[in-house]
Amino acid sequence: MTQTLSQLENSGAFIERHIGPDAAQQQEMLNAVGAQSLNALTGQIVPKDIQLATPPQVGAPATEYAALAELKAIASRNKRFTSYIGMGYTAVQLPPVILRNMLENPGWYTAYTPYQPEVSQGRLEALLNFQQVTLDLTGLDMASASLLDEATAAAEAMAMAKRVSKLKNANRFFVASDVHPQTLDVVRTRAETFGFEVIVDDAQKVLDHQDVFGVLLQQVGTTGEIHDYTALISELKSRKIVVSVAADIMALVLLTAPGKQGADIVFGSAQRFGVPMGYGGPHAAFFAAKDEYKRSMPGRIIGVSKDAAGNTALRMAMQTREQHIRREKANSNICTSQVLLANIASLYAVYHGPIGLKRIANRIHRLTDILAAGLQQKGLKLRHAHYFDTLCVEVADKAGVLARAEAAEINLRSDILNAVGITLDETTTRENVMQLFSVLLGDNHGLDIDTLDKDVAHDSRSIQPAMLRDDEILTHPVFNRYHSETEMMRYMHSLERKDLALNQAMIPLGSCTMKLNAAAEMIPITWPEFAELHPFCPPEQAEGYQQMIAQLADWLVKLTGYDAVCMQPNSGAQGEYAGLLAIRHYHESRNEGHRDICLIPASAHGTNPASAHMAGMQVVVVACDKNGNIDLADLRAKAEQAGDNLSCIMVTYPSTHGVYEETIREVCEVVHQFGGQVYLDGANMNAQVGITSPGFIGADVSHLNLHKTFCIPHGGGGPGMGPIGVKAHLAPFVPGHSVVQIEGMLTRQGAVSAAPFGSASILPISWMYIRMMGAEGLKKASQVAILNANYIASRLQDAFPVLYTGRDGRVAHECILDIRPLKEETGISELDIAKRLIDYGFHAPTMSFPVAGTLMVEPTESESKVELDRFIDAMLAIRAEIDQVKAGVWPLEDNPLVNAPHIQSELVAEWAHPYSREVAVFPAGVADKYWPTVKRLDDVYGDRNLFCSCVPISEYQ
């Protein structure tokens, strides 16, 4: 039969590109699990009362090329003015070698958080470099591997200051009046739930205030003034007050390290080390503290350890501080950080080295000096005598100056009384400075750059002598070796080769949704129209962003069944926090602020109780029954016991146990009956889209992991996005912003992120995914994710029992394999299986979550039957190896599992094992062999011998 033109146009072509199994493979798998069709399978699994009768109306699919053209037209509505607004955001020059070999390289951006260090040594080394940059520039002893943004880091610094403070009765946190306004906004939001009083005043008046446990100072103030706080910090320390300092990473190249001045905590944004502004993000924050406070620090910390052969190896250290272990007692709810962006910043430092960074910083400062000298020569007054890159210029005709700036397509900072702010950066040129002279002085200013340069070169007093750095930075060889592009390219490739990412194999991590991050989805993030906008530019310059964000929000509203979506949260954990704050403020608006009990099932992700604690709630755990479902009797009892103090329940759906609970609507009804709200964690949204929705189920608020369900890549541990969907009654209580009015959001609440739309520049990824899939493709993606999980479960259940199943013995989009009986019988653990999978070329499934002694597998819809079978065959082969141990063929203390993973050097070393080299390193054959570079990590050694900075190059050889 002749095809129609519509069929030939094939607007749904991308659906087949995104979904791994083709129609024939899908039918084979359906036959294997005993289902006639995808609809029949989901009809068996998903409770009838929550199945959508009609699909969400998000439109028909578009081809990759049509979607890119459509988004390009939207992006073209953004106006790319030259921005001198500053406030913590500047234009950058991202070295092309890093752009091409990291940011645009799936070997870097599709990797997961390095919980399995043996397959993560490359990005762990890059993160260790980031920590070394932080240590050198801040002058402190311990650094983390990034936080979500500078403002979040400030809030974490406040919380940490309280944890370590010896002034246990003090409850006030002092913030210097010249911190960035968005920083103050986020600090105030966090302080409210902790019950802290925030005092804002001139830094020199801090000693006038009593009962202060911590102080936040900014080394280079928001309007540009460099502060020498040495004496003040000394006085504060004598009073046992914890001192945090916000610092500019580029200024720190030239300025005295705050740690050397006595600061306890130093943080800031690493954005200007090569990361585009992107209308607010994503950007990595750096965070450092004194060694004595290391166990109270938030976020991931990379440490140096040893592997089983005694070789140097890297790992995430001190994980007992974190939410996935300590739950509500964790230092922070942080799960996702900003690994990809931290690694861009670290490689920027590697590529430029100390000499290059000093040249960049000195050039920025020289141009600022030239601008200042010219303006002063013509009679304009600078508000501050000491500055690095930012001038606060007093102007009589401010309106006229701003009008001339707009005509020249220039953005100046305009919110300063009787003055304008001008922040220069590494992209600023001589021509830009001359243009600024014209804007501020008129065209006939008569100034000459070279003449001014000679003047300031011999007589620059804009940085106080005491504030000039007198120590060397970045002396480690890694920062002094890779300065040619050839060397840099090879170094980055050597790191990439050490890691296992989606460009090599499936990553079957349960609760993580490691699906395809399609090239077409990634292309727009580097378009200048999206990458180069300042988050605080006038809204009329960001009409393309506003249109794209509004469309994406509308689609998410339809897909979730909610009434509004807030795009601000920078991660899933931050979305949880924002959603719980909305619930808290809603109760307060009804004079029910006493409602502070949050019910959380025993199976919940660790971020849930940690976020509830951060939102000022008490956590009460609800039991699960023998089938892994919420125990309704216990829920009713706990809700009744909480009574008028019940705030909410946090529940994941499908459950963290990998099943669609039949009673989910009843759970919602019980909580609502007692006046509580239902927070439905969106971590497993990939099994809902197009089939059901949180709003239809009965929830009030959810966060959406755009880095899971909606295809933003995990980046090796960030970036992520966690927007929240809410019912209408909660919409007035979502985060707002003190600098930018968020259109369509009538909220009066404080911010949770530095930028109004969080990591706005990665939102085009999710826009592209939804646009190319359409309603039809999105539903099919969910259905195939469910099919793939059930196929794996059905083929593996005889070898590894599936712990929890729902109706008809089915699972949702993931399954939990119970290793405990095998461990009791043979001594082989889930850890041994996880490490042995590396020899077979796979990243391990999620270990011991949500149940200790298990492996949780989530294949996603993007993996083909060929890849699923390869994984299944590997698991079955491992089961056969376990049987060899059980039969006594291999001793428990010396077999391929307990010695896994095996590395290349073992092939030429002496061999005393009872199994062959071939069994050790080529269990799945030689084709596409992945070689780990280290053997199994010694976690105990790493935590007992904590070392979190760069080691000699010889240690890696």
From Swiss-Prot:
GO biological process assignments: glycine decarboxylation via glycine cleavage system
Question: What Gene Ontology cellular component terms go with this record?
Answer: cytosol; glycine cleavage complex
**Cross-referenced Gene3D superfamilies:** Aspartate Aminotransferase, domain 1, Type I PLP-dependent aspartate aminotransferase-like (Major domain)
Enzyme Commission number(s): 1.4.4.2
Q: Which InterPro entries match?
A: GcvP, GDC-P_C, GDC-P_N, GDC_P, PyrdxlP-dep_Trfase, PyrdxlP-dep_Trfase_major, PyrdxlP-dep_Trfase_small
Required co-factor(s) are:
pyridoxal 5'-phosphate
Q: What is this protein for, i.e. what is its function? A: The glycine cleavage system catalyzes the degradation of glycine. The P protein binds the alpha-amino group of glycine through its pyridoxal phosphate cofactor; CO(2) is released and the remaining methylamine moiety is then transferred to the lipoamide cofactor of the H protein.
- In Swiss-Prot or TrEMBL terms, this protein is called Glycine dehydrogenase (decarboxylating)
Origin species, per record, is Shigella dysenteriae serotype 1 (strain Sd197)
